[in-house]
Amino acid sequence: MDNGGSVLSLSAPHFPYSATILRRHSPVASISFSLKQPPPQPPEPPESPPDLRRPEKSIGSSSSSSSPSPIPSPKTPLKINPLKGLTNRSSVSPLVQSEVSSKVSSFGSSLASKLRLSSKLSPPPPPPPPPPVEETTQFRDEFRSDTKPPEEETRNPQQEFRQEGKIFVGNLPTWIKKPEFEEFFRQFGPIENVILIKGHHEVEKNAGFGFIIYAAEKSAMKAVEFDGVEFHGRILTVKLDDGKRLKTKAEQRVRWVEEGEEDTKMSNKSSWHQEREGSRKSLQRILDTNGDNWQAVISAFEKISKPSRTEFGLMVKFYGRRGDMHRARETFERMRARGITPTSRIYTSLIHAYAVGRDMDEALSCVRKMKEEGIEMSLVTYSVIVGGFSKAGHAEAADYWFDEAKRIHKTLNASIYGKIIYAHCQTCNMERAEALVREMEEEGIDAPIAIYHTMMDGYTMVADEKKGLVVFKRLKECGFTPTVVTYGCLINLYTKVGKISKALEVSRVMKEEGVKHNLKTYSMMINGFVKLKDWANAFAVFEDMVKEGMKPDVILYNNIISAFCGMGNMDRAIQTVKEMQKLRHRPTTRTFMPIIHGYAKSGDMRRSLEVFDMMRRCGCVPTVHTFNGLINGLVEKRQMEKAVEILDEMTLAGVSANEHTYTKIMQGYASVGDTGKAFEYFTRLQNEGLDVDIFTYEALLKACCKSGRMQSALAVTKEMSARNIPRNSFVYNILIDGWARRGDVWEAADLIQQMKKEGVKPDIHTYTSFISACSKAGDMNRATQTIEEMEALGVKPNIKTYTTLIKGWARASLPEKALSCYEEMKAMGIKPDKAVYHCLLTSLLSRASIAEAYIYSGVMTICKEMVEAGLIVDMGTAVHWSKCLCKIEASGGELTETLQKTFPPDWSSHHHHHGFLDQVSDVDSDEDDVDGEDGEDDEDVNSVSDLLSPYK
């Protein structure tokens, strides 16, 4: 707080709780902390080209100002606890009665026994209603027909003045700026120029329409298809330019040259008729009583004929609190243009505007100007600078200005200490934060409750539960009453460390203490359940919150949509989006991301593309993550041509691909064995200056191993070594799998030894691939030894390991060994799948006619298990098994009758066509072929391509 008593508002965007009014008795200082996120930085007003201003128009000396407004945070009071059914009410809280009371503070010296705080929070201003669109003046005069040649009378004026690639966009919000206008329409193609028509009477607003000139006519046609799209609450009119505006400008120029007429309608209306003193009082009264109404504040200021330093200072401070640094600077320069010298307080307000807008370079420029003019920097000025760097995450710069403040000012206050502590908590440097707390206490400065919250938030970020509880205990010992912010810190701590049960316990303690939840605490609870994939409790918390009368915001809706997508209920997720729109909540890109990914993951690319188009029509500009979601789905479906089309569309929209985009494309080509394309996109990734990581090399190695180019794979590993990229178990598994496909046991064994030397532990996938290599080489003794070795190391075989072993015994024509392996697998509690039954039954049927009786009984047992499991084989497998049955039971029997129950339903119609059996020379089954050729599918149990997907 400065000497004049002005209250600074500082936002802390990383706080996990919402703003709450905190009061203490007999405050010694008054500091206003705003825990809300700062409003978005408004873009600079666009400069209108010279040819867009009418020559007759005279601009007045004053124009009304507008300011972008952040979204307000509604404060709906809670009536009852919505989490009443989630915990046991009769249980006693160990958090308050046992666990918290048993912790001892070990990181700071003792605090003062009586600490006081007066905190006053101001909600952000409401969004302004969209002003009516200014209609452009239409000139009614037309060219004289007698001055035109006869051939020009039949010429179409629309074709004469129309420009290719130019579109008209109408019904724009009058407050929109050129950068936002250009950013939205940039997604349809490269833009040559953007023309945003300024308002006639308010030049800082637009007239409600503008023009986009694309480099290609195709881009303009594509943009016109989105006529009727929603853009910041307005339904846009998008159509090709008809040349009418250029024709009107030509008519205006002709009249100006020939007649010299002045359009009296363009003259600005004067607003200087009110009394100066009454206007000043009106401004002060509005700032005191209705400061959130930005329209009323600006209107009152514009009515002052000759503002003084006081009025200018009030307006700079008003814009500074809102983070509107451009209008704050404009007001500051208007003051200097009148010959008024700024004071330290006005400079501080301007610096505060830049700090809230995250433009610390301009803030430091103001500091240099202050020093050049000999204006002393107050402690409040230093506090604002330190707070600005803290919010920007620049702890070193914050330390520099904090040290300078200590050198210049002998005594510091809790405000500047709170900001420097916040800077180090956000960078997870808790040792430095603890040292600052000790330093503050040694100076005799009482820590307000906000600093306790900052420390608890810092320990939450580093997941230090013990010290977080120590701070909570110390807070209560110093006489502070825990608020919803305090309990919100604890809830956030427990949800971050995965202890949702303790978070529920904190919620119960809140109810006992009479503290009600807010949107932030509810959001933390829902996030905790979503992380644990406990969808039922997440929805229960959401429903209880709605019953309490609280209105969810966009962030909460996004969390619920993610929960619906996580449980696979995509229809309910889309329904929730529609509910958001009915409640006038504007969906964001994050709203649609989980829906697009959900449909893509399930393989429904048609619906995924529909949601992508729906997102665009809602006014959301696609990001690289949105495009990556579509590409991931297409790659999983192996639709590489469509994936490349999405990549091209992404480039056309001006969205730069990242490492994940190219890596996913490379993985797609690797899955189909197209090594050339994989290397092509690897080169493209490097040419664009993107970082090459281990995931990129894994995709390249999979492409080489899939196509059998092991020498190329070795060259890739050498390049990895040259770049100092260590090989992990996934890289080794890919290489071992590549040699296993070729049956090269020696190379695979060498890689396993190399793994052990480098300290990389072989896992189940490594051993499974090596067993596959042994099976293909016919070395089943070594495969058996590998099983014993992995069991000795505590690595248990899984179903893919046993499937590989069964295939090996089948390939070695030892069905009795395969049957023994099958029995061992069931004894370990592993449930057989379709691939196991296929491999085992094929092997047994091939030997049943000449083998012992127990093999025949084994075939019967397996057939009955398949029938009970409801497994149906494909037609190729059925034909092959039928040929084996003819050798065992030529005239049919119990085995034939049982086995035919696993055949396809249309088997009987094919069975009567005897010629069909003669034409079948090979077996084409659902699962991998027993012979295990090098060109096996990705479902091959030895392939590691599907094993890497969880890692990615």
UniProtKB/Swiss-Prot annotation:
InterPro entries documented for this protein: Nucleotide-bd_a/b_plait_sf (IPR012677), Pentatricopeptide_rpt (IPR002885), RBD_domain_sf (IPR035979), RRM_dom (IPR000504), TPR-like_helical_dom_sf (IPR011990)
Source domain of life: Eukaryota
Main location: plastid
Biased composition range(s): Pro residues: 37-49, 122-133
Biased composition (Low complexity): 58-68
Region described as Disordered: 30-95, 115-163, 259-281, 918-952
Listed GO biological process terms: embryonic pattern specification; leaf development; RNA splicing
Pfam families the UniProt entry points to: PPR, PPR_1, PPR_2, PPR_3, RRM_1
Subcellular location per the Swiss-Prot or TrEMBL entry: Plastid, Chloroplast
Stretch forming the transit peptide: 1-60
Keywords assigned by UniProt, alphabetized: Chloroplast, Plastid, Repeat, RNA-binding, Transit peptide
PPR repeats: 308-342, 343-377, 378-412, 413-447, 448-482, 483-517, 518-552, 553-587, 588-622, 623-657, 658-692, 693-727, 728-762, 763-797, 798-832
Bias type Basic and acidic residues, positions: 137-163, 259-280
Compositionally biased spans, kind Acidic residues: 921-941
GO terms of molecular function: mRNA binding
RRM domain boundaries: 167-238
GO cellular component: chloroplast
SMART domains, per the entry: RRM
Function: May play a role in the plastid ribosome biogenesis.
Family: Belongs to the PPR family. P subfamily.
NCBIfam families: PPR
This protein's name: Pentatricopeptide repeat-containing protein At5g04810, chloroplastic
Species assigned in the record: Arabidopsis thaliana (Mouse-ear cress)
